[in-house]
């Protein structure tokens, strides 16, 4: 179990949120590995759009889940100081992306 996964489990027990980034980078890797794109430029554009729209959607989904939970339980909102490690991808998926650089940049 990686550090980011442990942080995600702790956060899910405390606040109801979930660490999406392990699953998000897994989806990116699978999309790059399974799909065969006709040109490098098209691959670059698709990855760029997917990363930003997917990242925004997952952040919005996680925020709404926390907001609904706190409002339904009528808990006073307390500002949470988020550390960089809370939303940083695990070392496993960083290693996967580093070793798949040939597929990303089409060398």
Swiss-Prot record:
The organism's place on the tree of life at top rank: Eukaryota
Its membrane topology: Multi-pass membrane protein
UniProt source species: Saccharomyces cerevisiae (strain ATCC 204508 / S288c)
Compartments, as annotated in UniProt: Membrane
TM annotation in the entry: 15-35, 43-63, 87-107
Principal subcellular localisation of the protein: membrane
Additional notes on this entry: Partially overlaps RPE1. Disruption phenotypes caused by deletion of this gene may also be a result of a defect in its overlapping gene.
UniProtKB keywords: Membrane, Transmembrane, Transmembrane helix
Deletion phenotype: Confers sensitivity to the synthetic tripeptide arsenical 4-(N-(S-glutathionylacetyl)amino) phenylarsenoxide (GSAO).
Protein's name in the database: Putative uncharacterized protein YJL120W
A GO CC term attached to the entry: membrane
